[in-house]
Amino acid sequence: MELIGHGHSCIEIRLNDGTNLLFDPFINGNPLADVSLADLHPDYILITHGHSDHIGDMLAIAQANKATIIAIAEVAMYAQSQGVKAHGMNLGGRYVFPFGSVKFVPALHSSGYEIDGVMTYMGEASGIILEAEDKKIYHAGDTALFSDMRLFAKDKSIDVAFLPIGDNYTMGPEDALEAIAYLNPEITIPIHYNTFPVIQQNPAIFVEQVVGGKVLNPGETILV
C-alpha cells in the first residue's frame, strides 16, 4: 500500500486493490496542503473527530466522489443530514468493510463543529485502527498520551503509527515518544504540527529519536 501525506493530519492510503482511503481531509484553509479537492478521489473518508481541521472538506470531497464517510456516530449523522453516505461507528467498535477492517479506539481530546454559528457536540474523539492487506495502521487523530495505548498493539503489532506531535492541542514530542514505547510500531510518522503558530515543531529532530521514524512531507509517498 501507499501512504501519502497531505499536511496536518490528512493521510491518503492507496491499497493494492485500487481502493483509496482518505483520513481527516483538511485541505482548504490548510497552509501545508499540497493538493486541491479536485486532486482527491477517495472511496472512503475516515474522520477521527469533529474539529474543523479534521472534518475539513469531507462533505465536498464525499459529494464529488460519491465516497462513504466512516466516522463516530454523531459525525456520521451530520454527514448523512447533508446528503452524503456515511457509516457511523463508536469507540471499541470494529467493522469489516470490503477493503479491510476499521476499529475506533479512544483518544483523549474534545470534538465539536460549528454549524449555523453554533458550536455543536460531535461525539467522542477517536483514533482509528485500519487492518488491510496484512498491515495494521494506527491513526491517532488528536490525543493526549494515555497508558491504554499499549492495548492497541496487544493482539497484533502495529506496522505504522501516525502520532500527533504539535503540543498545545495534542501531545507534544516528549509524550509522543512515550506513546511509541507503548505501541512499539515498526514505522512512526508524526502528524499535526506546523500548521498553526502554536504547534510549531521540528519533525526531523523527532524522528531522529525514533527507531523506524519517518517524516512524511506533503506530497511524499511511503510504501509499506
Curated annotation (Swiss-Prot):
What name goes with this protein?
A: UPF0173 metal-dependent hydrolase EF_1371
Supply the alphabetized keyword list: Hydrolase
Q: Which cysteines are joined by disulfide bonds?
A: none
Q: Which organism is it from?
A: Enterococcus faecalis (strain ATCC 700802 / V583)
Give the matching SMART domains.
Lactamase_B (SM00849)
User: Which superkingdom, per the lineage?
Assistant: Bacteria
Pfam families in the cross-refs: Lactamase_B_2
UniProt xrefs under PANTHER family:
UPF0173 METAL-DEPENDENT HYDROLASE MJ1163, UPF0173 METAL-DEPENDENT HYDROLASE MJ1163-RELATED
Q: Which family does it belong to?
A: Belongs to the UPF0173 family.
Gene Ontology terms, MF aspect: hydrolase activity
